[in-house]
Each structure stands twice: as structure tokens, then as C-alpha cells.
């Protein structure tokens, strides 16, 4: 059950974080009405409980009345799901209508604008449908049955963002929108056909751009668009991307429309390029080419010379050539906005190199055109008067050929970009009909002998299907095209496209355990969780939908592929999901996954119920944190068994001094527990954000203190030493901390070890010559060994060797890891030659695996509460480093030059 309401009074319960907090007038999404007058709901992306007395009770009554009436209309409705997020939802259509409406509600102040936009969109759709019908009629005359059937087929799988309109517009309009997007398939086909690539195609494109602008503004009412953006119907004045391509990737869209973002972004990219391409091809310059350059006869030139109009005509030509060059430059610039290997765009049939080759060819032709235009500019009318007009005519012919070639490249470029983009996103429901000639060509085709990684065999298979499923076509295109990757001799992937990586992930003929770990550790830098699940789920449904009778080897592979699919998802959800389950966005994402598993996966694979139960548990307990638990042992220090800090015999002793009364080994043990507790709760996403800044949105709002003891422990040690007035007592305290370091090294707590050694090497302590001079040789030798271990020389080589050979448990020094990650970020590009740098992610995973290894085994010490509280209190206290240094100068003032010389002479044995 889910509906939206408004708070009528403030509510806050600071004693329990499970309760919701809101103010009067806030919008609340009620998930469930509980017993005893309480509700479970979401407000400001936070979820919790609140009393029903704080909201408008009429909303509850109205909702229940409409809900029960819907039950009466659907007596065969299924029972509610086993968790409260899905309670009382009749079916997925009900959820799409009411759930999306609740999340994406628009404030009343914008209702007028919303209605106007809906009306504009409605009229545009009508105009597009009328134009599409006219285009269809013209195509029928050409006998292209595949296109006719395509435009007349209303797709069942359309872009997901029109579903938002479903909350306010009827189903007939949604069907019309679906038909409009299906008509996008005409663009590449029309560009191939000279007889129909004319006024109808241009009009069709203009209307599509208008519709796209309306949808963009509908989703982004917060963006200030140019004044002409909504009102103008002139294609040349519509810049589909007013400011920047990344405008649609803002946080506001991601927070409210995360599941819609990839579709919208892809659609924007496609329409942006098609806009620039058609803007080029419908430019006035092409009319110039038809009207002026075709009249390049000798008589025409001589006539212009006689009328003294040749110079003006030449200037007009040069001006139009300049406009053409500028227009082509804008088109090339628009193409730069699309990264062919990014997760926001879909795989292409052609490689990125094929597209780049067209760009290079276009650039080369533009350069030639520019040089020839310079030659044309240098020809004067007097040259023609001297019977030298043939050079002028030859240049006109050359320009004409060059312009026709440029136009052909632009059309081909647009066709390739648009068509290849539509393959994966839109080309899902086309069911082509074969003519007799095509059928006869395929009669002798043996599908079982086809190499399935060959595109020709794939096309032959698709053409033989009488009515292929949309999902089947989409996944065949996805699985077997655009799989580009560079594999080293040792079998490791260096660079690859996202398609190649995901296909490799799903392979069952190799041992890809480490590869899976690399991908799941770093997938958030390549693709969103929602997109990844959609792709993996589509693969599974594709395997399930294949006709095993016709494809003999698929039935043999079905269970292996299914098991691989389930294993990946189980590992992903249990250990590698980056989203925190503390907002409505993540909850709805899990809900979507639950429904897919319940409907499509469990019926084919009973073992998937384990994952279904895990998802149900997460939905029941959205505040569950996925973190390692500190292991607890049974060892207890007998030295402190009867120690009671609360009954200290001397109340004058400061708490800092109480620490010095404890045995150094016990202090080291308790520091190990504290340090490991902090270290084990650091999530991998906090390390990944050091490399990919865009992952900061996944980092917990209340971050674990990464350096829980580092700075505080350094200041505590330095202050404790300089607080002692007498040199001998300072020496004893110094020796005490060196002993603690010895035990920390023995227990492999390098984090605390580095902190204390850093404190002993700090200026306030290092300058205390008298204090250091009183240390015995054994303690001093021990310090030298520890100091060499923590030295930064040769990139911490001594420490790295020691860490490699140490036995768990261990708390490493995190500073070295962060340094390594920083070097990886600055020294390795994220993408290389339009492909993902997978080698960079492999190196990152090795670091994360090492950290995870140390996080997996805890210390088998029982924490002593009194000691833990004491250490937490004295270490976490804020200290002023300037005061510490001044105190160091007080206890051991600086030596004068005479005193320093006298000390050196005494130390050398002269006196």
C-alpha cells in the first residue's frame, strides 16, 4: 500500500532514530498503515515511523476506499508479498501508476506549467503521427515492406520515461507516444533513400526535436532554458542541449529519476547528434549548391562578368561555404559529447574506430574545401575577362564534388550514429517480414553449424525467425556485437568495452573468479547498479526465452549460465552493492530486483529462493549495514583482572597518567582492539572515492573515522611526554611508549605503531636531547629498529616487506594504501582509446583485496571496558600542538651556542 499525503503538524522523536522527522506541510509517502495508529513512510529520502495523527486522515480514508474498490474489480488479484514494502500492491501496473506518481509529484505552483506542457506534447504527438503516416505512404510506393511494418507496429517496450506521464494522461496517449518513438527507426532508413529523404523527413525530424524538447523541459522544470526553447517551431532555433550534455546527469535527476536516467541520457545523445546532422543537411547551403553550382557553365560565368556581378556571386558562395564549415564543426563538436565506452550509452554494432574514421574523413574534406575556397577567393573578375575563366569553372566543379561528398559523409555519419544507437535502445520489437527472394536465400542455412560469434550467422538466425521476441533481438545484438577488448598474453584484460567486460563476466568456459572480484569491486565506476542489474537480468531472460529445440547447444548450457548468473548476483548483493539502504531510491531499486526474481528467476531456478529471502530481509530491515564484525576472543589478561579504575586510590592522579600505570602489553592489546574496530568498518567505497570522485555520492553520510587514532594518538603521546617536569621521568615515559611499540609490532598493529613512532619523531619530542640521552642502549636499539621499519624511504620498502610476511590478525597503516591509490588515480587514465582501462581496476582490486584480507581476521582479545573507555577519553581529547611545542621548550630550553659547544666537547671526550 502506498500513497502520498501532507503533514499537518511537526513531529520529532530525537530519542529513537527509527522515527521519522518532519514539519507541517512536508510531503510524506506512506508505505504502510500499521496498527495502534502508526504509519511507516518516507520523507526527504529518509524512512521511519510516525503517528497517523500528524497527517491528513482523509487521505488514508480516500486511499482505502479506492483500494477496496480496485479489489472488487479484480477478484483474482494475488496476495500481497511477504514484506511490508509491497503490501497490498495488486500488480506491477498499479505500482507503476501510483508509486511513480507519488515519487515524482510536482508542487501545485507548477501545475499550470505542467498542463501546458502536456497539451503541447499532445499536439506535437498528433502532428508527428500525421507526418509519420504520410512518410509511410510514400515508402509504400517504394515497396520496402520491412519499414512499413516497422512504423505500423506499436512497440511494447518503449522508453521508460513516458511512464511518468501515465499518472495524468490516458493510456491512448501513452500508446501514441510509443508509436512516436517506434517511428525513430525511420530516420536511418530514410537517410538511405534519396527519393524520400526530402521535405517529409525534415518535417518529421523537426517535430521529433520539438517533442524531445518538451520532454526535456517536463523532466527538468528547474532548469532555465532560453526563451525560444518552448515556443519556437523552427528547427534551426532549437538547440536540444542548451548548456551541456551532462545537464541531465545532475543530482536532482539522479535522486528522483535514477531508473529513468539512462534512457533519457541516451535519447538526448542520439537526438543531439541527429539534430546537428540534419541541421547540416537541411542547411540553405545545399540549396545554394543546387541552384548556383549547377549553373557553372561558361555562358553563365561570362554573363555574370558582363553584368559585373561575378564578384558579388563569388562572395555569396564563399560566405555560404563558411557557414557550411561552421555548421560541420558544430556537428563534430556534438559528436565529442558521446563516449562510446561509457555506461550511459549503449553498445554499437560498429566499433568506435569506424565512427572515428568517418570523422577524420569529414575533417579532411572540410580542409580541402577550405583550401579550394581560398583559391576561388583569389580569382578576380579581370581574370575571366582575359579568357581565363576555365580556372574559375574548374574550381566550381571541384567545390560541387567536394560539397556532395561532405553531405554524403554527414548523412552516413548521422545514419550510423543514430542507427547504431537505436539498435540496443529502440530496435527491440521490429519483426521483419521476408520477401520471397530473401526466404529462398536462407532455405539452405544450417543454424547449428553457424559460428554464433559471427555477425552474419546472427543476422541469418534473426531473419529465419517468424516472430522473434523483442528481448531476444536486443540481447543478441548486445551479446555478439561491439565486443572489443585487449587481452594480454597472460590472459588478463588490459582495456575493453563495457559490453566485452560484461560478456566476459558471464562466461562459463573459464575460471573468472578474480575477474569477477575486479568487476564487482569497481563496477560503480563504469555503470550504475540499476543498469547493471537490467543488463544481467536481460541476459537471463534471453537464455530462458530461447527455443531449445532449435538451438541444441543452448539447452546444454542453460543451467551453467543460470548458475553463473545467480552466483554473480548473490556475491554482488551480499558484498559489493554500493548503495546504502537508507533512502527511498535504494528501497525501490531492491523492490524492482525482488519482483524480477519472483516472476522470472525463481520459476526457472529454485535455488534462487535463497537470494529472494536475502532481498526480502533487506527490505524488511533497510537500515541493515553490510560491514564486518569484530571477532571476539576468550583471552583475558590476568594482570588487570582485579584492576578497578573507578576506585583509584589516588584521586589526584590525572587520567593521562593512569594509562602509564597499565602494563605496556595490555595497552598494546587494547589499542589493537580499538584500531581494528575502526579499521574493519571502513567500507571499500571509501577507498574507491580516492580514485573516482563521482562515487562520493555512495559514501556513507556518517563516515567511519578512517584515521580514528592517528592524529589523536600522536598528540596524546607527545603531550604525555612533555608534561613531565623531571628529565628522568620523561625518559621513563619515553621508554614506556617504545615498549608499547615493541608489543604493537609483535601484534602486527602497524597503524598504532606508525602513530606513536611519528609522535616520538615529532619536533617537540625529537629535540629533547637530555631525555633521549638517558635511555639505555637496549631501548635505544629497539627504537632504531622500529624507526627503520616505519621509514618512508624507497616507498616504505621495509614496511611493505614486513607486511607481506606478517601473520593475521593485522592492522595495516592506511596511509600507504591511500598513497598507492593516489598514484593510481594520477598515473593511469580511466579510459584509453575509447575503451575502459580495466588494468587500472585490476590494480585497485589488488589493494582492496589486501585490505579485505586484513579486515577478515580480528584479534582474539576480550576488550576491557574500563581500559577502552579510558583510552578513548584520553586519546580523543582535543590538544593544541602549539602549546605542546611551547611546553617542550619549557622543560628543555634551547641551548646557547656556548652550551652547545661545551656539550659537543664533552660528548667527544675532549673534556
UniProtKB/Swiss-Prot annotation:
Function: Promotes the exchange of RAS-bound GDP by GTP. This protein is essential for mating.
InterPro entries according to UniProt: Ras-like_GEF (IPR008937), Ras-like_Gua-exchang_fac_N (IPR000651), Ras_G-nucl-exch_fac_CS (IPR019804), Ras_GEF_dom_sf (IPR023578), RASGEF_cat_dom (IPR001895), RASGEF_cat_dom_sf (IPR036964), SH3-like_dom_sf (IPR036028), SH3_domain (IPR001452)
N-terminal Ras-GEF domain residues: 489-623
Molecular functions per Gene Ontology: guanyl-nucleotide exchange factor activity
Domain SH3: 1-60
Entry-linked PROSITE patterns: RASGEF (PS00720), RASGEF_CAT (PS50009), RASGEF_NTER (PS50212), SH3 (PS50002)
UniProt-recorded name of the protein: Protein ste6
Amino acid at each position: 500500500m502506498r500513497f502520498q499525503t501532507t503533514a499537518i503538524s511537526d513531529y520529532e522523536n530525537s530519542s529513537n532514530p527509527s522515527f521519522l522527522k518532519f514539519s507541517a506541510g512536508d510531503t510524506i509517502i506512506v508505505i504502510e498503515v500499521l496498527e495502534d495508529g502508526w504509519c511507516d513512510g518516507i520523507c526527504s529520502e529518509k524512512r521511519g515511523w510516525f503517528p497517523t495523527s500528524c497527517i491528513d486522515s482523509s487521505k488514508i480514508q480516500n486511499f482505502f476506499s479506492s483500494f477496496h474498490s480496485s479489489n472488487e474489480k479484480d477478484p483474482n488479484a494475488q496476495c500481497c508479498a511477504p514484506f511490508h514494502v509491497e503490501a497490498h500492491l495488486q500488480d506491477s501496473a498499479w505500482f507503476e501508476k501510483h508509486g511513480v506518481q507519488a515519487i515524482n509529484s510536482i508542487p501545485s505552483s507548477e501545475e499550470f506549467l505542467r498542463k501546458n506542457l502536456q497539451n503541447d506534447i499532445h499536439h506535437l504527438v498528433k502532428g508527428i503521427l500525421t507526418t509519420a503516416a504520410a512518410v509511410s505512404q510514400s515508402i509504400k510506393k517504394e515497396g520496402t515492406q520491412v519499414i512499413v511494418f516497422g512504423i505500423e507496429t506499436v512497440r511494447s517496450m518503449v522508453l521508460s520515461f513516458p511512464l511518468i506521464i501515465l499518472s495524468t494522461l490516458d493510456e491512448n496517449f501513452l500508446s501514441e507516444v510509443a508509436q512516436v518513438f517506434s517511428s525513430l527507426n525511420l530516420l536511418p532508413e530514410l537517410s538511405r533513400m534519396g527519393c524520400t529523404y526530402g521535405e517529409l523527413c525534415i518535417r518529421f525530424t523537426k517535430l521529433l526535436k520539438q517533442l524531445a524538447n518538451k520532454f526535456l523541459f517536463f523532466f527538468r522544470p528547474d532548469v532555465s532554458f532560453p526563451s525560444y526553447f518552448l515556443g519556437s517551431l523552427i528547427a534551426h532555433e532549437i538547440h536540444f542541449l542548451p548548456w551541456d550534455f551532462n545537464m541531465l546527469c545532475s543530482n536532482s535527476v539522479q535522486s528522483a529519476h535514477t531508473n529513468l536516467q539512462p534512457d533519457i541520457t541516451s535519447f538526448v545523445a542520439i537526438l543531439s547528434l541527429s539534430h546537428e546532422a540534419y541541421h547540416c543537411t537541411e542547411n540553405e547551403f545545399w540549396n545554394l549548391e543546387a541552384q548556383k553550382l549547377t549553373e557553372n557553365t561558361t555562358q553563365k560565368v561570362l554573363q555574370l562578368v558582363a553584368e559585373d556581378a561575378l564578384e558579388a556571386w563569388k562572395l555569396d558562395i564563399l560566405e555560404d561555404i563558411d557557414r557550411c564549415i561552421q555548421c560541420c564543426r558544430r556537428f563534430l563538436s556534438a559528436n565529442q559529447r558521446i563516449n562510446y565506452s561509457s555506461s550511459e550509452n549503449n553498445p554499437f554494432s560498429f566499433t568506435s574506430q569506424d565512427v572515428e574514421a568517418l570523422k577524420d574523413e569529414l575533417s579532411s574534406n572540410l580542409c580541402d574545401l577550405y583550401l579550394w575556397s581560398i583559391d576561388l577567393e583569389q580569382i578576380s573578375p579581370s581574370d575571366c575577362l582575359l579568357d581565363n575563366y576555365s580556372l574559375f569553372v574548374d574550381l566550381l566543379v571541384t567545390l560541387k564534388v567536394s560539397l556532395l561528398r561532405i553531405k554524403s559523409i554527414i548523412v552516413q555519419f548521422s545514419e550510423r550514429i543514430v542507427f547504431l544507437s537505436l539498435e540496443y535502445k529502440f530496435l527491440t520489437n521490429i519483426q521483419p517480414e521476408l520477401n520471397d527472394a530473401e526466404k529462398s536465400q536462407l532455405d539452405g542455412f544450417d543454424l547449428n553449424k553457424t559460428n554464433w560469434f559471427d555477425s552474419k550467422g546472427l543476422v541469418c538466425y534473426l531473419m529465419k525467425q517468424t516472430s522473434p521476441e523483442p528481448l531476444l533481438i536486443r540481447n543478441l545484438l548486445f551479446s555478439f556485437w561491439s565486443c572489443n577488448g585487449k587481452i594480454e598474453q597472460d590472459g588478463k584484460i588490459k582495456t575493453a568495452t563495457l559490453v566485452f567486460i560484461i560478456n566476459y563476466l558471464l562466461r562459463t568456459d573459464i575460471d573468472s573468479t578474480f575477474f569477477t572480484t575486479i568487476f564487482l569491486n569497481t563496477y560503480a565506476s563504469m555503470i550504475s547498479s540499476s543498469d547493471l542489474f537490467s543488463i544481467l537480468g536481460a541476459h537471463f531472460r534471453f537464455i530462458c526465452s530461447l527455443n531449445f529445440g532449435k538451438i541444441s547447444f543452448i539447452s546444454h548450457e542453460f543451467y551453467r549460465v543460470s548458475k553463473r548468473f545467480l552466483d554473480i548476483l548473490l556475491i554482488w548483493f551480499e558484498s559489493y552493492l554500493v548503495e546504502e539502504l537508507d533512502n527511498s531510491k535504494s528501497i525501490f531499486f531492491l523492490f524492482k530486483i525482488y519482483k524480477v526474481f519472483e516472476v522470472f528467476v525463481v520459476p526457472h531456478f529454485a535455488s534462487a529462493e535463497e537470494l529472494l529471502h536475502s532481498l526480502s530481509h533487506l527490505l524488511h530491515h533497510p537500515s541493515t549495514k553490510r560491514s564486518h564484525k569484530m571477532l571476539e576472543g576468550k583471552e583475558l589478561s590476568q594482570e588487570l583482572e582485579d584492576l578497578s579504575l573507578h576506585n583509584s586510590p589516588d584521586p589526584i592522579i590525572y587520567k593521562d597518567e593512569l594509562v602509564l600505570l597499565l602494563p605496556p602489553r595490555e595497552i598494546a592489546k587494547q589499542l589493537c582492539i580499538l584500531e581494528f574496530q575502526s579499521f574493519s568498518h571502513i567500507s571499500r567505497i571509501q577507498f574507491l572515492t580516492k580514485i573516482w570522485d563521482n562515487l562520493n555520492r555512495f559514501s556513507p553520510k556518517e563516515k567511519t573515522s578512517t584515521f580514528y587514532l592517528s592524529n589523536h594518538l600522536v598528540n596524546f603521546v607527545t603531550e604525555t611526554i612533555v608534561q613531565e617536569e623531571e628529565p628522568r621521568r620523561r625518559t621513563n615515559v619515553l621508554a614506556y611508549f617504545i615498549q608499547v611499540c615493541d608489543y604493537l609490532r609483535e601484534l602486527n598493529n602497524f597503524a598504532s605503531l606508525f602513530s606513536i613512532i611519528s609522535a616520538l619523531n615529532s619536533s617537540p619530542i625529537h629535540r629533547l636531547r637530555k631525555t633521549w640521552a638517558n635511555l639505555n642502549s637496549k631501548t635505544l636499539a629497539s627504537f632504531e629498529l622500529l624507526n627503520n621499519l616505519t621509514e618512508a624511504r624507497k616507498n616504505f620498502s621495509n614496511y611493505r616487506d614486513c607486511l607481506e610476511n606478517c601473520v593475521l590478525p593485522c592492522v595495516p597503516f592506511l596511509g600507504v594504501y591511500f598513497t598507492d591509490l593516489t598514484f593510481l588515480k594520477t598515473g593511469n587514465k580511466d579510459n584509453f582509446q575509447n575503451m575502459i582501462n580495466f588494468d587500472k581496476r585490476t590494480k585497485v582490486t589488488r589493494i582492496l583485496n589486501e585490505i579485505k584480507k586484513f579486515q577478515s581476521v580480528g584479534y582474539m582479545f576480550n576488550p576491557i571496558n574500563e581500559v577502552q573507555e579510558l583510552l578513548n577519553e584520553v586519546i580523543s581529547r582535543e590538544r593544541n600542538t602549539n602549546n605542546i611545542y611551547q611546553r617542550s621548550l619549557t622543560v628543555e630550553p634551547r641551548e646557547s651556542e656556548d652550551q652547545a659547544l661545551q656539550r659537543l666537547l664533552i660528548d667527544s671526550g675532549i673534556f
